[in-house]
Curated annotation (Swiss-Prot):
Source species of the chain: Polynucleobacter asymbioticus (strain DSM 18221 / CIP 109841 / QLW-P1DMWA-1)
Chain positions recorded as Mg(2+) binding sites: D530, D534
Disulfide-bonded cysteines: none
HAMAP family: KdpB
Transmembrane segments: 35-55, 64-84, 225-245, 266-286, 600-620, 628-648, 671-691
Membrane topology: Multi-pass membrane protein
Family: Belongs to the cation transport ATPase (P-type) (TC 3.A.3) family. Type IA subfamily.
Designated name of the protein: Potassium-transporting ATPase ATP-binding subunit
Keywords assigned: ATP-binding, Cell inner membrane, Cell membrane, Ion transport, Magnesium, Membrane, Metal-binding, Nucleotide-binding, Phosphoprotein, Potassium, Potassium transport, Translocase, Transmembrane, Transmembrane helix, Transport
Length: 691
């Protein structure tokens, strides 16, 4: 997606965020965050106490109450600012998407007039894209902007999707395959396609993207809800504790005959400093930023729930082709069966591949031409009928002169031959095993009931993929390779790539069964898919990343869409989810650890007049009780601002196991949360004493 990269504190983001910070002071917005709502109420109470002090009836000096009041309001505003800044980044992304929506016209045709070729195209009616409805059909030719999301039902065209994906390389969109989905706002570069509209106005992919990224009423994720409950429970505990301090203070003064009861302003300051305001103020920003980071990676998540689930994933199902291997298998050798010459095998293999537009099919045609000078033939001129590949048959080929010529997986061809009453030779099975053990893919070719031999397809594992899988393994994530190859080929590639397990000769039903098996054992499963046959498994998976180049059914079944249509992106999705959970956990640890230092600052200051012995707890040697309280309140507010970059950017991602992550978290953010307030409060106290 083409967009200018904004800095974290870019003026375009900061100015609206400041305005939104004040707009969010509305009680209807504040009560959604229970912890910060307590600070909000405390700010109102101290404001009333300050107004009272102006008339000479205050419990403390008006300047002290004013200082506490202002910094309590700043605490609320800083939390609002963190959330508004995160939302602002999403809104900026939505604005760039909205810029893609331009006035577009469509060449609408009647359903009965779908052309088989461009020369026979019917007359079309020029209508505005806003008039198109689900089920309508339009034609798009070179230089036309595709008017709406839809499925290609005829033709093939080169399409520029850079407006959506940011990738300048054009993509091919054609009918009848897994690359039939087109997106409104993209442009046809060459040839023509007939498109059936799959959405109504306002429901397009871009509309849904805009809605997802700028939706202010973001649904809380389960972990976020659980953490909120914990924070509310802590707040209630501290509220009860602070509420008991007033009668305790009054009793202590009466019993000791010295000092004065604790002031309401001090109690409010103590409560605000003790409750977990840091994480409460940043919690929403962390969630929004997580979705924003996904979008920066060109992945659109339907909800924060999907991003969070990615962080909890235990099992990754990865398609071999395009994810683990480069996906451009090339024919490299012909292994003829007994009684068949290599040239005869090449001839039949080429016939089976004439109408096969896959890279593998085209490479077979080219290899036959290079090795034996077998020229390509026009499939219609030789009276052949193409039989396309399906996930169920796992074969393709042609029917010609009453004979079935097929190529496909060994098990599929064996089943096909035996169904026709033929015999599958043992030497061919041995050739299949030999090819598989080399890590190549064997395609068996047959003519009628006769097995002609094996075509060897070489596959190349992506560089660095083994190291990525090792990182995932350290994090406790199990990787499973999904492939249609036979078990020997799958085992060879799985060993080379370093995956934990593999599923060979996989059908859509096998994928679905595997997902359900792992889920029944309490694991979360992530997978990618692009075809209609992937839709059931995508719908079942906890994290389902659909390819933007895939079918409409796949995109509707998934809870994320990868605009780059890169299956390897699933690993990045999981890492981003992990980073969001790590950030939330780290800042929660830091926030709770903060309370210890604030306790040493405020408790002695609040009761030292009554109990001078408490001066021993003033380990920071703060200059005065009022300065100590004010310093703690100021630090409590400023730490939110200082942690905003960490909340938005996320903590540094490390591929570690749960125990190692916990140790790292406690060392950096637990110990850091203990030490930082002692230093910060002391520095602020020194500044106040100078002023």
């Amino acid at each position: 997606m083409t967009k200018r990269k904004l800095g974290m504190f870019d003026a375009e983001l900061v100015k609206p965020a400041i305005v939104d910070s004040f707009r969010k002071l509305s009680p209807s917005i504040q009560w959604r965050n229970p912890v910060m709502f307590v600070v909000y109420i405390g700010s109102i109470l101290t404001t009333l106490l300050w107004i009272q002090s102006l008339y000479g009836e205050g419990e403390a000096s008006s300047s002290f109450i004013l200082g506490v009041m202002l910094w309590l309001w700043f605490t609320v505003l800083f939390a609002n600012f963190a959330e508004a800044l995160a939302e602002g980044r999403s809104k900026a992304q939505a604005a760039s998407l909205r810029g893609l929506k331009k006035e577009t016209w469509a060449k609408k045709v009647k359903a009965a007039n779908i052309p088989e070729n461009w020369d026979n195209r019917p007359a079309s009616e020029l209508v505005s894209a806003t008039q198109l409805r689900k089920g309508d059909i339009f034609i798009a030719e070179a230089n036309d902007v595709i008017a709406a999301d839809g499925e290609v039902i005829a033709g093939v065209a080169s399409v520029d999707e850079s407006a959506i994906t940011g990738e300048s390389a054009p993509v091919i969109r054609e009918s009848g395959g897994d690359f039939s989905s087109v997106t409104g706002g993209t442009r046809v570069l060459s040839d023509w396609i007939v498109v059936r509209v799959t959405v109504n106005p306002g429901e397009t992919f871009i509309d849904r993207m805009i809605s997802m990224v700028e939706n202010a009423k973001r649904q809380k994720t389960p972990n976020e809800i659980a953490l909120t409950i914990l924070l509310v429970a802590l707040t209630i505990v501290f509220l009860v504790v602070v509420a008991t301090l007033l009668p305790f203070s009054m009793f202590s003064v009466a019993a000791s005959g010295s000092g004065s009861p604790i002031q309401i302003t001090v109690l409010i300051a103590l409560l605000v400093c003790l409750i977990p305001t840091t994480i409460a103020g940043l919690l929403s920003a962390i969630g929004v930023a997580g979705m924003s980071r996904m979008m920066a990676a060109n992945v659109i998540a339907t909800s924060g729930r999907a991003v969070e689930a990615a962080g909890d994933v235990d099992v990754l199902l990865l398609d071999k082709t395009g994810t683990i291997t480069l996906g451009n298998r090339q024919a490299s050798n012909f292994v003829a069966a007994s009684g068949v010459t290599e040239a005869e095998l090449a001839d039949i293999a080429q016939l089976a591949s004439l109408a096969d537009e896959t890279p593998e099919g085209r490479s077979i045609v080219v290899l036959a031409k290079q090795k034996f000078n077998i020229r390509e033939r026009e499939i219609n001129s030789i009276g052949a009928q193409f039989v396309p590949f399906t996930a169920q048959t796992r074969m393709s080929g042609v029917d010609m002169n009453g004979e079935q010529i097929r190529k496909g997986a060994a098990s599929a061809i064996q089943k096909h031959i035996e169904s026709l009453g033929g015999h599958f030779p043992q030497e061919v099975l041995k050739a299949v095993d030999d090819v598989s053990r080399r890590g190549s893919t064997p395609l068996v070719v047959s003519q009628g009931t006769r097995v002609m031999g094996v075509v060897e397809l070489k596959d190349i594992v992506k560089g660095g993929i083994k190291e990525r899988f090792n990182e995932l393994r350290q994090m406790g994530i199990r990787t499973i390779m999904i492939t249609g190859d036979n078990k020997l080929t799958a085992a060879a590639i799985a060993a080379e790539a370093g995956v934990d397990d593999f599923l060979a000769e996989a059908t859509p039903e096998d994928k679905l069964a595997l997902i359900r098996k792992h889920q029944s054992e309490g694991r979360l499963v992530a997978m990618t898919g692009d075809g209609t046959n992937d839709a059931p498994a995508l719908a079942q998976a906890d994290v389902a990343v659909a390819m933007n180049s895939g079918t409409q059914a796949a995109k509707e079944a998934g809870n994320m869409v990868d605009l780059d249509s890169n299956p390897t992106k699933l690993i990045e999705v999981v890492e981003t989810g992990k980073q969001m959970l790590m950030t939330r956990g780290s800042l929660t640890t830091f926030s709770i650890a903060n309370d210890v230092a604030k306790y040493f600052a405020i408790i002695p200051a609040a009761f030292v007049a009554t109990y001078p012995q408490l001066e021993a707890l003033n380990v920071m040697h703060l200059s005065s009780p009022s300065s100590a309280i004010l310093s703690a309140v100021i630090f409590n507010a400023l730490i939110i601002i200082f942690l905003i970059p960490l909340a938005l950017k996320g903590v540094t991602y490390k591929p570690l196991g749960a125990a190692a992550l916990l140790r790292r978290n406690m060392t950096i953010y637990g110990l850091g949360g203990l030490i930082a307030p002692f230093i910060g409060i002391k520095i602020i106290d020194l500044i106040i004493s100078v002023i």
